[in-house]
Amino acid sequence: MPVLRVPVVALAVVLASLAGAPLSAQVRLADESDRAAFRAWFVLLADAQFERATPDVADCAALIRHAFREALRAHTPEWVRRSALPFAPQFADVQSAPKAGSGGWPLFQISDGPKPQFAEFADARTLIGFNTRPLGRDTKALRAGDLLYFRQPGQKEPDHLMVFVGRSMFDAEGDDWVVYHTGPTPDGPGEVRKVRLATLQQHPAPRWRPLTSNPQFIGVYRLAVL
């Protein structure tokens, strides 16, 4: 089944100020410093799920939604306390991030058309289809915060995403770390796992290797806000 894609809006925009428009995960952050701040927070928060899981992360898409949402928050001392991180990150906040409203925080585009819809929830296929842009199938294109997309036909949940961390703040060695949630398994709720890209490329099951020779590896995708 082909991946649903829409053009990415790359123009500078004034987020969350135009007639109450939501911040779309399909719209690139206008300021380079905001993109750098978002990337730093997103990568850290995805990586941190391996160190201390949070109850809202139950599958691969939930891990990405969590890191995306929390990266946009104001990282106050109270936020740091509640986050249970082992240290207080010194990253700048995303200055153009909107505040959550009374109707929630619909960050993710979930439909196409003249009036696209936005929601707080988006599954793996929707995240890829409406909220990222493809970079091809060569992992040399990976930057920290990019996604690895696999599609496994025959599985109940065929679409699977992993986050490329690169250099981890929790590991002294390695610059090619990848983190992901397995999703529920027949034996339980699943878990967050972390692996080096080089190791993943030699996975015992070839269908999970991020290689151009693997038809189940769809490719590398970048969050459209970046």
Predicted regions and their residues:
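N-terminal secretory signal peptides that target proteins for export/translocation
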Residues: 1-4
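Bacterial N-terminal signal peptides
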Residues: 9-18
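Residues at the start of alpha-helices and the adjacent loop-to-helix junctions
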Residues: 17, 56-59, 137, 154
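N-terminal capping segments
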Residues: 22-119
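...with weaker cross-activation on analogous glycine-rich loops/strands in unrelated enzymes
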Residues: 88-187
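Low-complexity, Gly/Ser/Thr/Pro-rich intrinsically disordered linker/tail segments
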Residues: 175-226
